[in-house]
Curated annotation (Swiss-Prot):
Keyword rRNA-binding: no
Residue ranges with Basic and acidic residues bias: 600-617
Protein's name in the database: Chaperone protein DnaK
Species for this entry: Clostridium novyi (strain NT)
Molecular function in Gene Ontology: ATP binding; ATP-dependent protein folding chaperone; unfolded protein binding
Modified residues (Phosphothreonine): 175
Protein purpose: Acts as a chaperone.
Keywords from the named record: ATP-binding, Chaperone, Nucleotide-binding, Phosphoprotein, Stress response
């Protein structure tokens, strides 16, 4: 069985991990970093960039650079690039392809399976969209796992010998979750979860961006938010300032030539203090308090029952966030995990559980939101309450609302509001063929089945006729099977094009290298190369120069090989000549030595004769 990788598909950064020797290991990307920016860009020539290289060129290419796509998962949002619409699943798939390729390079084998994390508060359509993104990227998503749960898996892997309750506060780039788990005897049981899928580090950046833009507008009368390139520079500066204010109390924001008007170029040079930043973002920090209270209440615990507090997500490095969590829990958060990597590591642990590499761990997760159907009067009738352990199956008997009704429409909703219209619609389907009868007589059994990924299947059965209908929830905002298949083919085409571009670069680099090395060697050898040989090599050099900048890779390869082979003949010939000359020289020296030795031997004989001692007679 091949390796199953663990992926944290984040709003601003993503990370991939794998189990090695019983422990999760973060896989560095091709650029050497342990996390990859969740950024996709398209160049003018159609080339696709993902990760750090995409983020680097965002200022000069703002229209074709896509960031924070995770915030649109499970919606009908589309990104238009060069006249083509891309769904959030397709853009996310490009990020997943990059992570998959980095993992394959690290492991030296093909990777086809993954465990992918999602915010605990992701609804059904957002989870399904994540799974679809994996499929488009060529990954069989074996499990969708909640981010705080994954973090607790990584945190608790070496702490399974004792029972304790963990409070996980997860503030990422675009989403916020809080989960309370109980760990004991290898069982990770989620007691409750709460959160906000529209709150994260991006919002803290936005506060700084707005502050800079408003200050600049007040001084210069120009709103930089109307200039895409200036806006991208503002975003980068805001993110940098936020990070610096985590370790220092003041930072300088310097953006020369940010714009210009009739009076000339305009610059930004201003200081931002941590105190001002905390004032600007106080409402965001405050917005995380209520979900913490709700999670505790749903878990039927008090803060005194909590043993450990774990911070997850890069935004938890913000001092005001840490202070808020510490004040609420009364406990110092654990510093033993890297907030940027722990979720991916937990996903790798879950992958290890699936492959059997990690034993004696049982993960009991929950569904974050109440699931139900619309009943008479537009009421939302719950079948599965929020924080129910999954996988689970619940059934309930309903009946008709009118006499002689032969069909019923099943409207599935997700949320905590009392009226169906105020909750999120997950799907609709119809059960027909019901035997005519007075209202309230037919018995229709509606069953909700949630799998371990948190994805819902709904069925309805008329107990009188045995007629049955069912639906696996795929919201209208998600891609259809045909659209997914089409996206898979396009992703494969993109991958093939990327591979072709890579091959083109390598072939042309080899050609340039062969030209340079041969020209240099010819120059260094000078007159040692015979004119005929030099002419042959120069012909091959010229032949390669003629084709090296074209797109016919086979012609470039052929010309490179012919040049290399021709020069090899010349160098072999020179080597043989040098060897022959050296051998002749050695023979001449040896002859001279032998003559000297013969003379020396005669001399020795004379000396021996002179000093010959004879016995006395």
């Amino acid at each position: 069985m091949g390796k199953i990788i663990g992926i944290d598909l984040g709003t601003t950064n993503s990370c991939v991990s794998v189990m090695e020797g019983g422990n999760p290991v973060v896989i560095p990307n091709a650029e050497g970093s342990r996390t990859t920016p969740s950024v996709v860009a398209f160049k003018e020539d159609g080339e696709r960039l993902v990760g750090q290289v995409a983020k680097r060129q965002a200022i000069t290419n703002p229209d074709k650079t896509i960031i924070s796509i995770k915030r649109h998962m499970g919606t009908d949002y589309r990104v238009n690039v060069d006249g083509k619409d891309y769904s959030p699943e397709e853009i996310s798939a490009m990020i997943l392809q990059k992570l998959k390729a980095d993992a394959e390079a690290y492991l030296g084998e093909t990777v086809t399976e993954a465990v992918i994390t999602v915010p605990a508060y992701f609804n059904d359509s957002e989870r399904q969209a994540t799974k679809n993104a994996g499929k488009i990227a060529g990954l069989d998503v074996k499990r969708i796992i909640n981010e705080p749960t994954a973090a607790s898996l990584a945190y608790g892997l070496d702490k399974m010998d004792k029972s304790h309750k963990i409070f996980v506060y997860d503030l990422g780039g675009g989403t916020f979750d809080v989960s309370i788990l109980e760990l004991g005897d290898g069982v990770f049981e989620v007691k409750a979860t709460n959160g906000n899928t529209k709150l994260g580090g991006d919002d803290f950046d936005q506060k700084i961006m707005d502050y800079i833009a408003e200050t600049f507008k007040a001084e210069n009368g120009i709103d930089l938010r109307n200039d895409k390139m200036a806006l991208q520079r503002l975003k980068e500066a805001a993110e940098k300032a936020k990070i610096e204010l985590s370790s220092s109390t003041k930072t300088n924001i310097n953006l020369p030539f940010i714009t210009a008007d009739a009076t000339g170029p305009k610059h930004i040079d201003m200081d931002l203090t941590r105190a001002k930043f905390e004032e600007l973002s106080a409402d965001l920090v405050q917005a995380t308090i209520e979900p913490m209270k709700k999670a505790l209440a749903d878990a039927e615990l008090t803060i005194n029952d909590i043993d450990k507090v774990v911070l997850v997500g890069g935004s938890t490095r913000i001092p005001a966030v840490q202070e808020a969590v510490q004040k609420f829990t009364g406990k110092e958060p654990s510093k033993g995990v890297n907030p940027d990597e722990v979720v991916a590591m937990g996903a790798a642990v879950q992958a290890g559980v699936l492959t059997g590499e990690v034993k004696d761990i049982l993960l009991l997760d929950v569904t974050p939101l109440t699931l139900g159907i619309e009943t008479m009067g537009g009421v939302a009738t719950p079948l599965i309450e929020r924080n129910t352990t999954i996988p689970t199956r619940k059934s309930q008997i309903f009946s008709t609302a009118a006499d002689n009704q032969t069909s019923v429409d099943i409207h599935i909703v997700q949320g905590e509001r009392k009226m169906a219209g105020d909750n999120k619609t997950l799907g609709r389907f119809q059960l027909s063929g019901i035997a005519p009868a007075p209202r309230g007589i037919p018995q229709i059994e509606v069953s909700f089945d949630i799998d371990a990924n948190g994805i819902l299947n709904v069925s309805a059965k008329d107990k009188g006729t045995g007629k049955e209908a069912n639906i696996t929830i795929t919201a209208s905002t998600n891609l259809s099977d045909d659209e997914i298949d089409k996206a898979v083919k396009e992703a494969e085409k993109f991958a093939a094009e990327d591979e072709k571009r890579k091959e083109s670069v390598e072939v042309k680099n080899n050609a340039d290298s062969a030209l340079y090395q041969t020209e240099k060697a010819l120059k260094d050898l000078g007159d040692k190369v015979e004119e005929a040989d030099k002419k042959n090599v120069e012909e091959k050099l010229e032949a390669l120069r003629q084709v090296k900048d074209g797109e016919d890779l086979e012609a470039i390869k052929k010309a490179t090989t012919e040049l290399t082979e021709e020069f090899y003949k010349v160098s072999s010939k020179l080597y043989q000549q040098a060897g022959a000359e050296a051998q002749q020289g050695a023979q001449g020296t040896q002859g001279a030595d032998m003559g000297g030795n013969a003379q020396g031997k005669d001399d020795d004989n004379v000396v021996d004769a002179d000093f010959k001692v004879e016995d006395d007679k």
